[in-house]
Swiss-Prot record:
Name listed for the protein in its UniProt record: ATP synthase subunit alpha
Self-association and partners: F-type ATPases have 2 components, CF(1) - the catalytic core - and CF(0) - the membrane proton channel. CF(1) has five subunits: alpha(3), beta(3), gamma(1), delta(1), epsilon(1). CF(0) has three main subunits: a(1), b(2) and c(9-12). The alpha and beta chains form an alternating ring which encloses part of the gamma chain. CF(1) is attached to CF(0) by a central stalk formed by the gamma and epsilon chains, while a peripheral stalk is formed by the delta and b chains.
InterPro entries referenced in this protein's UniProt entry, alphabetically: ATP_synth_asu-like_sf (IPR023366), ATP_synth_asu_C (IPR000793), ATP_synth_asu_C_sf (IPR038376), ATP_synth_F1_a_nt-bd_dom (IPR033732), ATP_synth_F1_asu (IPR005294), ATPase_a/bsu_AS (IPR020003), ATPase_F1/V1/A1_a/bsu_N (IPR004100), ATPase_F1/V1/A1_a/bsu_N_sf (IPR036121)
Physiological role: Produces ATP from ADP in the presence of a proton gradient across the membrane. The alpha chain is a regulatory subunit.
Compartments where located: Cell membrane
PANTHER family: ATP SYNTHASE SUBUNIT ALPHA, MITOCHONDRIAL (PTHR48082:SF2)
Chief localization: membrane
GO molecular function annotation: ADP binding; ATP binding; proton-transporting ATP synthase activity, rotational mechanism
Lineage: Bacteria, Bacillati, Bacillota, Clostridia, Eubacteriales
Length: 504
């Protein structure tokens, strides 16, 4: 085959012109040590803190320690099949989770992958797990109430939209029950709820999901689950992932409620990771930045300014204490970060007062501005009267003779305590809370036997719903008790009381 010299030059010129100079550069490193879900990698020169690192077998890791000669990574999956000498690659991305309406009603893990067997989550939007909190200019003050449906909380420790209210107490004192009732009470109120389970038993999470489904609450709820069998890095990521899912709705102008259950186990997971990464331990062996761990999470809860849509993210973090010790490291940290705390006591719980809220040391620092005026009117003296009752009850144990005024206060206190008892999964509409608290505070229950109070309460609501239906509507409409409404309430309660007392 004869090729002319000029043809050779044209072929060479053509090949030079078509030469593809696209060179793919991969920033890679080599595993020099692996074990306990932690990998030390040599290389990865320009790696970012918190960057996703691609390991063999489709496993990803997260770079947390950037040291002089290596990078410490935590694995977000199983370490089987990954060994020293394997090559890892940078992804140049940080950890993201899927967000959007498609997540509502689903149970997902810390990375947003569905674990409820209902197929993939069909959403195209992702959001970084770690996002800076809104600044001071981007926020507005908390002034709208978020009703929990629990009389003791809505009256004495009110929660507002955008607030962070800590639920703290020993194990088995009903902390999760309060959070669950609050989620159930948001039904029909256009509030998206997110329940983040950190380090819990799988059976417990399954039970919670089952209850939420049964009560119809999964229609507006996302469950993010990182159970005790998951690795420490996944437990560490869970609350941040849940928060990012909530922020998506907050920036769309919606109201969101998020429950972190619980941050004690979250701190333990972070301590595990930190010690394995050889970070220096501090008090109770927690690392020095354990305060920042929770503050950067809880500061993301806010009520956004009207310019940004006016959405809100309300947080209910849960912390477990040991033998009621609120002076331990994690409880004091979270108390100082949040806008108040609901303290649950095992003594009250075992004595049959449920929810076992200790009104003495429970407080809401910003929720008072959000409380509706009608509730303020009936609950204003409630905390003081309960405190005086407890003091008198302790004094009367010595068997000393009490004057008439003290006996009257004791009897009223017993009825107040009885009224504040409430069964689980029985949240109450705010207008009914106001009606029964009005009756209790204004001495309408003083001649009802204590053991008949619950029956009286139930039948009073039925009576008012039948004969005085407009009372509840008026309370919701005016949001305050006018003199006319008070006299109508007095008449309704007295009318029913006469019927009730004649039957017992």
């Amino acid at each position: 085959m004869n090729i002319k010299p000029e043809e050779i030059t044209s072929i060479i010129r053509q090949q030079i012109e078509n030469f593809n100079t696209n060179i793919e550069t991969i920033d890679s490193g080599t595993i020099i040590q692996i074990g306990d879900g932690i990998a030390r990698v040599y290389g990865l020169e320009d790696c970012m803190e918190g960057e996703l690192i691609e390991f063999p077998n489709d496993v990803y890791g997260m770079a947390l320690n950037l040291e002089q000669d290596n990078v410490g990574c935590v694995l977000l999956g199983a370490e089987e099949g990954i060994k020293e000498g394997n090559v890892v690659k940078r992804t140049k991305k940080v950890v993201e989770v899927p967000v959007g309406e498609a997540l509502v009603g689903r149970v997902v893990n810390s990375l947003g992958m569905p674990i409820d067997g209902k197929g993939p989550v069909l959403t195209t939007e992702n959001r970084d797990v770690e996002v800076p909190a809104p600044g001071v200019i981007d926020r507005q003050s908390v002034k709208e109430p978020l009703q929990t449906g629990i009389k003791a909380i809505d009256s004495m420790i009110p929660i507002g939209k955008g607030q962070r209210e800590l639920i703290i107490g020993d194990r088995q004192t009903g902390k999760t029950a309060i959070a669950m009732d609050t989620i159930l009470n948001q039904k029909g109120k256009d509030v998206i709820c997110i329940y983040v389970a950190i380090g819990q038993k799988q059976s417990t999470v399954a039970h919670i999901v089952n209850d939420l489904t049964k009560m119809g609450a999964m229609d507006y709820t996302i469950v993010v689950s990182s159970t005790a069998s998951d690795s420490a890095p996944l437990q560490y990521l869970a609350p941040y992932a849940g928060c990012s899912m909530g922020e998506y709705f907050m920036h769309k102008g919606k109201d969101v409620l998020i429950v972190y259950d619980d941050l004690s186990k979250h701190a333990v997971a972070y301590r595990t990771m930190s010690l394995l990464l050889r970070r220096p331990p501090g008090r109770e062996a927690y690392p020095g930045d354990v305060f920042y761990l929770h503050s950067r999470l809880l500061e993301r809860s806010a009520r956004l300014s009207e310019k940004l849509g006016g959405g809100s993210l309300t947080a209910l973090p849960i912390v477990e204490t040991l033998a009621g010790d609120v002076t331990a490291y994690i409880p004091t940290n979270v108390i100082s970060i949040t806008d108040g705390q609901i303290f649950l006591e095992s003594e009250l719980f075992n004595a049959g007062q449920r929810p076992a809220v200790n009104a003495g040391i429970s407080v809401s620092r910003v929720g008072g501005n959000a409380q509706i005026k009608a509730m303020k009117q009936v609950a204003g003296t409630l905390r003081l009267e309960l405190a005086q009752y407890r003091e008198l009850a302790a004094f009367s144990q010595f068997g000393s003779d009490l004057d008439k005024e003290s006996v009257k206060r004791l009897e009223k206190g017993k009825r107040l305590v009885e009224i504040l008892k409430q069964p689980q999964y029985g949240p109450m509409p705010v207008e009914k809370e106001i009606i029964i608290l009005y009756a209790a505070v204004n001495n309408h229950l003083i001649d009802i036997p204590v053991n008949k109070i619950k029956e009286f309460e139930k039948e009073l609501f039925n009576y008012i719903d039948t004969h005085y239906r407009d009372i509840g509507k008026d309370i919701l409409e005016h949001k305050q008790l006018t003199d006319e409404l008070k006299s109508k309430l007095d008449k309704a309660i007295n009318d029913f009381k006469n019927v009730f007392l004649s039957e017992i």
